Structures are given as structure tokens and as C-alpha cells.
Amino acid sequence: TFYFRPQNDVVLEAGNRYTYIVKVNATGLTLEGCTIGDWTDGGGESGAAEDLGYSIQNDGSYMVYNAKGLLAWNKAVQKDESINCTLTADIDLTGKDWTRIGTWPGYSGVFNGQGHRIKGLNFSAATTELFGLLNHRGVIKNLQLIDVNLYGSNGSAAGIVDQNEGQIIACSVTGNISAYGRTCGIADLNYGSITACWFNGTLKDYESGAIVRYNYATITSCYWGGNVGQGAFRNEGGTVDATKVDGATVKWQTAVDGMNTALTAGD
């Protein structure tokens, strides 16, 4: 393994990619754009590249393929709540600390799970959700949260987001959600749209809604199973199209067909 150490600082800017062609000759290493000499054996140092778990695209969006990468995006999005994220593999967050995303004015990017799963989301906090506030430009889609175990110690708990003002599309949550106060499977408050989403699990039965607690906007073709009797605890002038899968009159295949119809309605 060989290393070179330039005499002057080399500045590599975050979010950019740098490609060099390396040629080895008798006098040193030649890189595209610069020549570096006086190189020596690295003395046994490891030359293995660190697996960051993500790559950054030209537009600044993250492509994430493991827990380390998702946590790196989480850290970045705390400073810039418009950064897009796309999952390219299933993610295991078991044993990882999660900071929910979206304070005022809220997350405004696109989080695309591409049908992949996030498992192991297991934590207790004042309020526990993957996202805090999704603003009117924000989108969360094609995401599965499986086997969550959430406890809101000082308020509400929901699977996907505390307050939705954007779009939640084709997302699902399974597991157990409890709280000192209110619980819901997808969102606590809905001021946006929730389409083709489902929840299957156990909620603390206090002001709970399998899809949302308070709905002020639109819920379309959503389904749930589990111990809760209503898709929305309270509807405040919105539209609620949410159906419980009881295994008798409504089965999960019915739910799948209904959600697929909603997702392809505009095609």
C-alpha cells in the first residue's frame, strides 16, 4: 500500500466528486492535474476506504444503503431540511440512536424509500416519530417501517410523522406504539395528504387513530389492522377514506388492490 502526502493542503469540497487518473513511474505518482513525488511505502497502514453507507449526487441528495449512511443523512438534514434521501437497500437501525427530522418550518425534501424497509426503530423520547414536521413541499413515499417499538414519554407517538402538511404516499408501519398521551400509526396531525398507507400493530388505546389522530385534510385508500377501532380519532372537516382489515369482510388482498388503484389513478 502506498500513500502520498502533498506539501500543500488539498481542499476537497463536500458534495463534490473528484476523479484522478493515477500513473506510477520511476519518479513518483502522476495525477491528472498535478504531479506528486517523494512517495514512500505507507509502512503497513491500511489503505482500505471507509464505507460511508451513502453517496451524494450532483444535486446534493443522498443515496443511502445502510444504517451508517442513514444516520449521516440525518445529521446533515438537521442543518438543511431540504436534502433529499433515497434508500437503495433495507436498513437496520437496531441499537442506533435516532433524532427525528423536521423542526419549524419542517422537512421540505423528498424521502423515497423505494419500497425498502427500515427495521429496529426502537426508542423512547418526549415524542417519537421518524419525522417531526413535514411541510407543504415535503414528500415521504414508498417506505416500510417494520417492527417498531416506540414510546412517547411526554406526549404523542406516531410511526411516520408528528405533523404532516405535505404528502405521505405508499408508506406502512408495523409494530407497537405507546405513549404517555396519544398514539397513531402514520401521523398525529394531518394537514396534507396521506395516500395508500397502512398500519398493522398495537396502539395504546387513548385518543388513538390507526392512520391519524386529527385529520384536517385528505386520507385516501388507507387501511389498518390491529387493536384500534378507527382510522382517524377525529376528523375536523377533512376526507377520511380508511378501512379496517378484519380478515372477514375486508382482507389484506382487498387492501392491496385498493391501494394500488389509488396509486395508479393518475396514470
Positions of PLM-derived features:
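Extracytoplasmic cysteine-anchoring/structural motifs
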Residues: 1-52
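Surface-exposed repetitive/solenoidal architectures
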Residues: 49-267
